[in-house]
Amino acid sequence: MQMKKLLPILIGLSLSGFSTLSQAENLMQVYQQARLSNPELRKSAADRDAAFEKINEARSPLLPQLGLGADYTYSNGYRDANGINSNETSASLQLTQTLFDMSKWRGLTLQEKAAGIQDVTYQTDQQTLILNTANAYFKVLNAIDVLSYTQAQKEAIYRQLDQTTQRFNVGLVAITDVQNARAQYDTVLANEVTVRNNLDNAVEELRQVTGNYYPELASLNVEHFKTDKPKAVNALLKEAENRNLSLLQARLSQDLAREQIRQAQDGHLPTLNLTPSTGISDTSYSGSKTNAAQYDDSNMGQNKIGLNFSLPLYQGGMVNSQVKQAQYNFVGASEQLESAHRSVVQTVRSSFNNINASISSINAYKQAVVSAQSSLDAMEAGYSVGTRTIVDVLDATTTLYDAKQQLANARYTYLINQLNIKYALGTLNEQDLLALNSTLGKPIPTSPESVAPETPDQDCAADGYNAHSAAPAVQPTAARANSNNGNPFRH
């Protein structure tokens, strides 16, 4: 009895858990999944860790080097007149400590600088992942909007085709009006194929970044959408000078190249090593004539300490050549820094201009949608009284939905440009994604079939016009008015 009482509770808990798992993902959740599973970011993290671990390798030659050696030798004097056999065992312990070797110290410094560059690279890859995730996410939302508007446009033109066919059947319009409406409907059908494919590709691009498919995503909350103008461009440039990661990486690379010149010049300097050691040796003899003094068994130990000094005097010009190579590399790194600086200035200014252009585009397309709707209403009213043609109505319909698509695209472009300028400044982080995440609203499906279900019956009805267009064209007006078969949309 208790199990029967618990069963509904367990089922309810399992269903509630399933609904949580199936909820629409928002931008922040998608990014967290990408951060954990993106192979490019994980590779970058591994490269950074390897670079820092290599610092320990570069430091190791400066630390004491301790070695243990052992040796055993057996000698058989079968051709020796004395017939002496011997067993010799020896062992040694040797320590080497670098007292002065500037090239090894320089190598440690170089590796520390190289690890710093790799760390900046990892930070850049983190920001790149944030930008790529947002790009892919909003690209899916934009593709969904485009498909939705294309579907709405198709429905609107279908209604116009239906109405025009009815008017043609009763002799109110010419066959050219029906043909124009049908041509526009076919154009939208062809465009629908493209936008469906674009949505599929956008979903696939998001999967490539995160490793997951998302049946639903949180959509943009258009009602609460607002725009903010960026700071003055000079203030942005000053901030980018100090924080842009590409610029920082170029500066570190120049500093590394400068240090490599010093390392090459160290090839002229001497080295000094301390080499203390201790060893023992045990020798025993056997044979018929081992009574001589030189064949007495021995057991000896020895301690040594020494200094090893080396000064390169001439190496065939190798050191001078290495110095010149390092100097040329420094020139190249300096030019790369200048190139990075120019690129940062261009990127910041372009991002600043793009944000302002996006804001202007949003405002312009808002007005364009209002104007296009008013124009369509006027064209439909004029067509109903005969002052406008069906071409005017179709053009106005296309203009309206084009404006709606452009408005949606302008909103997403603005959001991406907001991230682009943060990326150019070098300050892009998860807080920026949280800010964008707050602009999202209700969940929407991501599959084309769910966004805009296909309408085979409607398309078939539109195709049916071709089979019936010839017959009504030769019928008198009264006959067309009384015919039920002249309108393929009434099947």
UniProtKB/Swiss-Prot annotation:
Induction comment: Constitutively expressed (at protein level).
* Keywords of the record: Antibiotic resistance, Cell outer membrane, Membrane, Signal, Transmembrane, Transmembrane beta strand, Transport, Virulence
Biological process terms from the Gene Ontology for this record are:
response to antibiotic
Kindly list the GO molecular function terms attached to this UniProt entry: efflux transmembrane transporter activity; porin activity
Query: What is the predominant subcellular site recorded for this chain?
Result: membrane
The signal peptide here is: 1-24
Cellular-component GO terms for this entry: cell outer membrane; efflux pump complex
Question: InterPro entries, from UniProt?
Answer: Bacterial_OMF, OMP_efflux, T1SS_OMP_TolC
As for subcellular location, the record says: Cell outer membrane
Membrane topology term: Multi-pass membrane protein
Q: State what the entry records as the consequence of deleting this gene.
A: Non-invasive for a number of mammalian cell lines; avirulent by oral infection of BALB/c mice. Increased sensitivity to acridine orange and novibiocin. Decreased resistance to bile salts and SDS.
The region called Disordered is annotated at 267-287, 445-491
Write down the superkingdom of origin.
Bacteria
Q: Which SUPFAM superfamilies match?
A: Outer membrane efflux proteins (OEP)
Give start-end positions of Polar residues composition bias.
272-287, 482-491
Biased segments, Low complexity type: 467-481
Q: Give yes or no: UniProt keyword Signal.
A: yes
State the protein's purpose: Outer membrane channel, which is required for the function of several efflux systems. Required for virulence.
The protein's assembly and partners? Homotrimer. Part of tripartite efflux systems, which are composed of an inner membrane transporter, a periplasmic membrane fusion protein, and an outer membrane component, TolC. The complexes form a large protein conduit and can translocate molecules across both the inner and outer membranes.
| Family listed | Belongs to the outer membrane factor (OMF) (TC 1.B.17) family.
Q: Which PANTHER family match?
A: OUTER MEMBRANE PROTEIN TOLC (PTHR30026:SF20)
UniProt name for this protein:
Outer membrane protein TolC
This chain's source organism reads Salmonella enteritidis
